[in-house]
Amino acid sequence: MATQDFYQVLGVSKDANERDIKKAYKRMAMKYHPDRTEGDKDMEIKFKEIKQAYEVLSDPQKRQMYDQYGHEAFEQARQGGAGHGAGGFGGGGADFADIFGDVFGDIFGGGRRQQARAQRGADLRYNLDMSLEEAVRGKTVELEIPTLVECRDCNGSGAKKGSKPQTCGHCHGSGQIQMRQGFFAVQQTCPQCRGTGTIIKDPCRTCHGHGRKEETKTLSVKIPAGVDTGDRIRLANEGEAGEHGAPAGDLYVQVHVREHPIFARDGNNLFCEVPVSFTKAALGGDIEVPTLEGKVKLKVPKETQTGKHFRLRGKGVKSVRTGEVGDLICKVMIETPVNLSSKQRDMLEELEDSMGTGDEAAKFRPKEKGFFDGVKQFFDDLRS
């Protein structure tokens, strides 16, 4: 990254106080910010140098280490931590990887050596398809899950029965080795044991030393009432078995609710369209509407218009989180009669004639009058 001394990058002296460093950073960052330099690659690099310099010099601990070991030491540690070319193993000198690891680890990825640990099992996902009725009421389902399970013959160790894994002699069980580069020691995963810290000299014949084997397991899963598309149910430790006795992953059941031929769902409310004859809508009366528990009666007032909504409280879905029950909202759709006989057409024409025309008919069809009045006003405005 920065080839210049960090103090030079920010344009401050080595005895600059925190306020001066912050002020210089703001000035330089504003000057070289990518939004101002319009994709200039050199300016982007300069901006990153400024940011890196400020990250070090604004932190008292990092600044003290930087002042003590110098910019060249910092650059070598950064390059080593980033996995650049390295010299041989061993060698003398201070272990600067440990010194810089905690202090500069957030900048160039360094860190202290960690004890080798077996890898946790992978998480699994199962897509569960459900009907609306099943989702609303809840159900218990049997799931067939192809997965990796712990080998029963070696109890997950990977070693043949009667034997056990041996400590890796290359890394002495740490799973990490050190490579020297100048003054610095760079940690890498041990190639002999691949970071596990152990070597299996006599592998289990069932799992071939992996400690796990492929198997399809059956799980009985209770799906709570009220789930909806997008909900996810976590089953802890039901994912793939971990390596060599490490914890298993989790299983996530992803819910998808199929579309229903009658009901649509929005949150905890259900919606449906209810056909009503034009005579029933005009005269009023009772109709039957469907719910998930069966049919119920709904009183339709006289002169009901198409699109009118009626709310049936408590006939929706029970929330899986709060326990509150939503409503069923019915939208009236008035049906125009079809396949009329001659007599029925004559009766409708007689009804139409009885309503008159013009202003006389407006009281029977207020929306129609309002619509045509609006159309007339629209064209009047165009002409004016």
Curated annotation (Swiss-Prot):
Zn(2+) 2 binds at residues 168, 171, 190, 193. It comes from Idiomarina loihiensis (strain ATCC BAA-735 / DSM 15497 / L2-TR). Belongs to the DnaJ family. Pfam families: DnaJ, DnaJ_C, DnaJ_CXXCXGXG. GO terms for biological process: chaperone cofactor-dependent protein refolding; DNA replication; protein refolding; response to heat. This is Chaperone protein DnaJ. GO terms for molecular function: ATP binding; heat shock protein binding; unfolded protein binding; zinc ion binding. InterPro entries: DnaJ (IPR012724), DnaJ_C (IPR002939), DnaJ_domain (IPR001623), DnaJ_domain_CS (IPR018253), HSP40/DnaJ_pept-bd (IPR008971), HSP_DnaJ_Cys-rich_dom (IPR001305), HSP_DnaJ_Cys-rich_dom_sf (IPR036410), J_dom_sf (IPR036869). Its main location: cytoplasm. HAMAP family: DnaJ. A zinc finger (CR-type) spans 138-216. The J domain is necessary and sufficient to stimulate DnaK ATPase activity. Zinc center 1 plays an important role in the autonomous, DnaK-independent chaperone activity of DnaJ. Zinc center 2 is essential for interaction with DnaK and for DnaJ activity. CXXCXGXG motif repeats lie at residues 151-158, 168-175, 190-197, 204-211. It comes from the Bacteria.
